[in-house]
Curated annotation (Swiss-Prot):
This is Thymidylate synthase. It is an enzyme of class 2 (transferase). One of its GO terms (biological process) is dTTP biosynthetic process. Disulfide bonds: none annotated. Keywords: Cytoplasm, Methyltransferase, Nucleotide biosynthesis, Transferase. Pathway: Pyrimidine metabolism; dTTP biosynthesis. It catalyses: dUMP + (6R)-5,10-methylene-5,6,7,8-tetrahydrofolate = 7,8-dihydrofolate + dTMP. It comes from Nitrosococcus oceani (strain ATCC 19707 / BCRC 17464 / JCM 30415 / NCIMB 11848 / C-107). Belongs to the thymidylate synthase family. Bacterial-type ThyA subfamily. One of its GO terms (molecular function) is thymidylate synthase activity. DUMP binds at R21, R126, R127, R166, S167, A168, D169, N177, H207, L208, Y209. It is found in: Cytoplasm. The gene is thyA.
Amino acid sequence: MKPYLELIQKILDTGVERDDRTGTGTWSIFGHQMRFDLRQGFPLITTKKLHIRAIFIELLWFLRGETNVKYLHDHGVTIWDEWADEQGELGPIYGYQWRSWPLPDGGYLDQMAKTLTQIRNHPHSRRHVVVAYNPACVDEMALPPCHALFQFYVAQGRLSCQLYQRSADVFLGVPFNIASYALLTHLIAQQCDLDVGEFVWTGGDVHLYRNHLEPARLQLTREPLSLPHLRIKRRPPSLFEYQYDDLEIVDYQSYPAIKAAISV
């Protein structure tokens, strides 16, 4: 995961200091891209330990189209609690937009199901796009989508994915996002009888929060270890029926976790 460490170094070397919505302040750059060949291993950073269960459960929650933290809590995950209301609701965030994008006639579009059908039937289409950032719904969301749009690309029997992340918390968020969309690419590839290709991460406002500068510098002192691999133990009837126990990360070795505060 050297591209990730190179991004941290780039922000420390060239980033500009800016105020932000949370009041924490950031060092940021605008526009950056990283590429990961999924055939070479699963892109989990190894320079600090990640909470793999939280990453995988969150993606399965998105795929279910849910917006209440109950499913997360039922599986021991609390990463969305800071934004949920007293009933556990978060508004029309990722899962809602992926599975129930509102239409002008009052109906809904299941973007994920439609994209899956397109990949199967028209793999070379340039329209394999799913959008989470719905401007008409932003004010109703507890947190507007940071990872805003993603696109799939099929070539030579391999499925690749590119994510555009409008706002990128490099220390806490980006490692989760890379792993989450890499997993999504693997799942869709399995459902469509394809191999995996690349995951391409593209960021807009790419930043380190002020209180993450020292933890980020600590990561830079650690030499990356070999990447683990993903094992999918079952192929369910649909993309929306995977369970956590269907997934296994093999040979994940990492340095210890590095604690850092989240900015809400």
